[in-house]
Curated annotation (Swiss-Prot):
PANTHER family with a match to the protein in the record: CHLOROPLASTIC GROUP IIA INTRON SPLICING FACILITATOR CRS1, CHLOROPLASTIC, CRS1 / YHBY (CRM) DOMAIN-CONTAINING PROTEIN
Chain coiled-coil ranges: 131-159, 447-477, 517-553
Lineage: Eukaryota, Viridiplantae, Streptophyta, Embryophyta, Tracheophyta
Any one cellular-component term (Gene Ontology): ribonucleoprotein complex
UniProt source species: Arabidopsis thaliana (Mouse-ear cress)
Protein name, entry field: Chloroplastic group IIA intron splicing facilitator CRS1, chloroplastic
Length: 720
């Protein structure tokens, strides 16, 4: 620490040699050490800046051309060179050129040496895996196919003895069934994903290969495009594409949702509406070629559709115009916005539920219908909230062929509300809404749906039935027998009025003019009587449960035989009792009494406490003091101890029991004879708790019945 130099102020990565140099610098007054100090400083500077250059490698010195040149020419110039010094040095440092190390960085050449142990202890990825093993097996099988495997195997068996043992194990087929593990794995059924066959595009079929390649090269350089929003390929988009074609033969189009999810459909739409050819497709971009003067789209062959599409088209025929900007798979749904808003003479279809059936759907039926509706194609596309009578009439026609109508909501349509759409359609059609969100609406025709033909037949049948009823009524009135009733010498002519309009009018005249107050009184009386009957029924159920619980409690109590108290009770003086009470209150160890009460385990714990101390403290959580006293007496009787006192604590009541002066621990067999086990004690506690709850609820029912009877009596008194 001389001359104001603090070693701790330097970086912490100083080595022991550097610290030694610092100490030498502090003693620089000694002239004998100056030369040694200069040598160490030069070595320190070179090693500090370039630690990799201090290695004494023969190969490194051989490859350092500049250093060799400098060493060869050192005899030419032996002048000292001033080099940078450390901060603690007082004077300059002068060294000869041959004493300076070359500080130029050089790339360390890689040593090309073959390591024979690389394949043994170095880890290689993909060498010991399942795929690698399969490749090895395939290569071995190929080798076997090329060579004569049978002769080779026979020669090997003759030369080596252990191969015969392996063959015997393979023939046994006990463990592996005669096949190696990788052979069994290959026999498993694996359903591979089939690659989609690449279908040539329209541009590849029409344009020449050279022209198509040139157009694709130019298309890859384009940086300007036309955006297609959610509304699809509208007229504005088509006009922008055609305006770009005036300046260039190519136009780039970028699709937004939902068309970007189905670029094949987007390509069909763009070619159909613009009349061009798509020459390049990449992600959500399409490049459209305007085509030459000889190109015409009329001569193209129609794409053969699948049976699924043909059936769906046949289902939608006659319902309305199709929506050609459809962004999903075929068939094209009906554009509901082009259907009329108001249909003259439209009425909600009549409905009639079949006998012994409910029109309301159950949860299982609703789930089943949703699963059915998921793979179905969309039938309609809707973009407005009101004026849906045309769509409703089309849905009713569709329901004659299909029980479910699936409606998609247009992307990009303004002010659409799927809730209002669903409510309007449900009101107009009378169907059942099984699914609704911001993308689609699914309607079920219902169990009570009747097609137009069936509804007409039902109406004709009802009309015929009413005609027959009218005929029977007129015939019965004409054939009524006249009854002669003679009263006080007078002859009266009366007819049989049963089932006629006169009978109804008489009943209406007799009972129809009752006071509304009397009707309210009768209704209230009927309600009270019904409630009284219900409460009495519930009370009878509670009483039956109480009887059952009493029987269970009686059986459990019969298993417990309380021991008889000992007549020879040990007498304690007041001083001894007070002393034992204080000892018991100061004790930290205690025995907690749970919901099971006094059983075999409690007595074992009590005697275990008495094994080490004279007083045992038992804590119980019972709220009623009478139950606490009963528990204390039971503990005193069963343990043959002396009850000291019962103290009120913060956590409950503490029962202090003294074991006695002549204490002797009884055997566990004697204690288990008359006490309940842990399981039986828990069952007894549960039954007692249930019994108390049932009695409480029965008391509430009895009070409610009494109140109802009083209300019924008061109502009858007020009526008179």
């Amino acid at each position: 620490m001389r001359n104001g130099i603090n070693i701790l102020s330097y970086p912490r990565f100083l080595s022991f040699c550097e610290v030694f140099v610092l100490l030498l610098c502090n003693f620089s007054d000694n002239p004998k050490l100056q030369t040694f100090t200069q040598m160490l400083n030069s070595l320190f500077l070179s090693a500090r800046a370039f630690p990799s250059l201090i290695t004494n490698s023969s190969s490194r010195r051989a490859k350092s051309s500049q250093f060799d040149q400098f060493r060869e020419n050192r005899g030419v110039s032996d002048a000292a060179i001033k080099v940078p010094t450390a901060p603690w040095m007082k004077g300059p440092l002068l060294l000869r050129p041959d004493e300076i190390l070359d500080t130029k960085k050089r790339n360390k050449p890689r040593k090309v040496e073959e390591k024979t142990f690389k394949a043994l202890n170095r880890r290689e990825s993909g060498v010991r895996g399942k795929k690698a093993m399969k490749k090895i097996v395939r290569n071995v099988e190929k080798l076997d196919e090329d060579s004569d495997s049978e002769e080779t195997q026979m020669d090997d068996l003759s030369e080596f003895e252990y191969l015969g043992r392996i063959e015997e194990k393979v023939e046994s087929k006990d463990r592996f069934g005669g096949k190696m593990p990788w052979e069994r794995e290959e026999e498993r059924f694996i359903l591979r994903r089939m690659k989609k066959e690449s279908v040539p595009t329209t541009a590849e079929l029409i344009l020449d290969e050279g022209l198509l390649n040139r157009l694709r090269r130019e298309a890859s350089k384009m940086r300007k495009w036309v955006n297609v929003r959610k509304a699809g390929v509208t007229e504005l988009v088509v006009n922008k594409i055609k305006s770009m074609w005036k300046l260039n033969e190519l136009a780039m189009v970028r699709f937004d949702v939902p068309l970007c999810r189905n670029m094949e459909r987007a390509q069909e739409i763009i070619e159909m509406k613009t009349g061009g050819l798509v020459v390049l497709s990449k992600k959500e971009f399409l490049v459209v070629y305007r085509g030459g003067p000889s190109y015409s789209s009329e001569g193209q062959d129609e794409i053969s559709s699948s049976l699924y599409e043909r059936e769906a088209d046949r289902l939608l025929d006659g319902l309305g115009p199709r929506y050609m900007d459809w962004w999903m798979r075929r068939p094209f749904p009906v554009d509901a916005d082009l259907l009329p808003e108001v249909v003259n003479g439209y009425m909600t279809p009549s409905r009639r539920c079949p006998p012994n059936t409910r029109a309301k759907l159950t949860d299982e039926e609703l789930t089943y219908l949703r699963n059915i509706a998921q793979p179905l194609p969309f039938h309609f596309v809707l973009g407005r909230n009101y004026g849906l009578q045309g769509l409703a009439s089309a849905i009713v026609k569709l329901w004659e062929k299909c029980i479910i109508a699936k409606i998609a909501i247009k992307w990009g349509a303004l002010n659409t509300n799927n809730e209002e759409m669903a409510d309007e359609l449900r009101y107009l059609t009378g169907g059942v809404l099984i699914l609704r969100n911001k993308y689609l609406i699914v309607l079920y025709r219902g169990k009570d749906f009747l097609s137009d033909e069936v509804a007409d037949l039902v109406e004709d049948r009802e009309r015929l039935l009413s005609r027959y009823q009218h005929f029977e009524e007129t015939k019965r009135e004409s054939d009524i027998e006249l009854l002669e009733v003679v009263t006080n010498g007078k002859q009266l002519k009366e007819t049989n009025k049963s089932g006629t309009l006169l009978e109804f009018q008489e009943l209406q005249r007799k009972f129809g003019e009752m006071d509304p107050r009397n009707l309210e009184t009768e209704a209230e009386k009927a309600r009270l009587e019904k409630e009284l009957k219900s409460q009495e029924h519930k009370l009878s159920i509670l009483k039956s449960k109480i009887e059952k619980s009493n029987m269970e409690l009686f059986k459990l109590n019969s298993l417990w035989k309380p021991s008889e108290g000992d007549d020879d009770i040990e007498i304690l003086t007041n001083e001894e009792r007070e002393c034992l009470r204080r000892i018991g209150l100061k004790m930290n160890s205690s025995l907690v009494l749970g919901r099971r009460g006094v059983f075999f385990g409690v007595m074992e714990g009590l005697h275990q406490h008495w094994k080490h101390r004279e007083v045992a403290k038992v804590i119980t959580m019972q709220k009623l003091f009478s139950r606490v006293v009963y528990t204390a007496k039971a503990l005193e009787t069963e343990s043959n101890g002396v009850l000291i006192s019962i103290e009120k604590l913060k956590e409950g009541h503490a029962i202090l029991i003294y074991r006695g002066k002549n204490y002797k621990r009884p055997s566990s067999k004697l204690m288990a004879q008359n006490l309940l086990t842990k399981r039986k004690a828990l069952q007894r506690s549960v039954v007692m708790q249930r019994l108390g709850s049932l009695k409480f609820f029965a008391y509430q029912r009895e009070r409610a019945i009494e109140d109802l009877k009083v209300s019924l009596v008061n109502l009858q008194d007020s009526a008179f």
